[in-house]
Design a protein with these regions (language model features):
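Charged, amphipathic alpha-helical coiled-coil/dimerization segments
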Residues: 48, 70-133, 140
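N-terminal helix-turn-helix DNA-binding core of bacterial DNA-binding proteins
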Residues: 19-64
Length: 151
């Protein structure tokens, strides 16, 4: 059976990424990509995190997170340092510019939420999210683990 579910998901993903990029550009932020957003938001929610824990939170490999965090450090949004109790552990935390970026990303996320569910009743949103979560789990259960950076 051929259906266009993947095509629709891919198009929505592209539209959301484009919207995020355009909204960031309006704020003068051109040095990050949407995939950095997950790191910024997790650090906003949890404060300072060990890099390996951050990787688990955003479902990426430690290598991918290291690469993304290095870019955020270079841009001044994140700082890293060794954990006081174990110098083998690298911690990541938002800087002041990173906290401002997090607030901007939250505003953009709210706008996306309003647009993506416009005209869709709440009970249908619940069903949609449940089906998408199950689809994601199906891939994970069958060895299709998402391990690559998306940006």
């Amino acid at each position: 059976m051929i259906d266009n579910t993947f095509t629709l998901i891919s198009r929505i993903d592209g539209e959301i990424r484009r919207f995020i990029t355009e909204e960031l550009a309006k704020e003068g932020i051109t040095d990050i990509v949407p995939s950095h957003g997950a790191i910024i938001v997790e650090l906003m929610k949890h404060g300072q995190l060990p890099m390996n824990e951050l990787a688990r939170h955003i479902d990426r490999t430690p290598q991918t997170v290291t690469s993304l965090v290095k870019k955020l450090v270079k841009s001044g949004y994140v700082e890293t340092g060794k954990a006081p109790e174990d110098n083998r552990v690298t911690m990541a935390a938002l800087t002041d510019p990173g906290a401002r970026l997090a607030a901007t990303l939250c505003r953009i996320s709210e706008e996306i939420y309003e647009h993506q569910y416009q005209g869709i009743p709440g009970d249908e949103i619940v069903v949609l999210r449940s089906a998408l979560a199950r689809m994601h789990a199906n891939f994970a259960e069958n060895g299709f683990k998402d391990t690559e950076s998306m940006g």
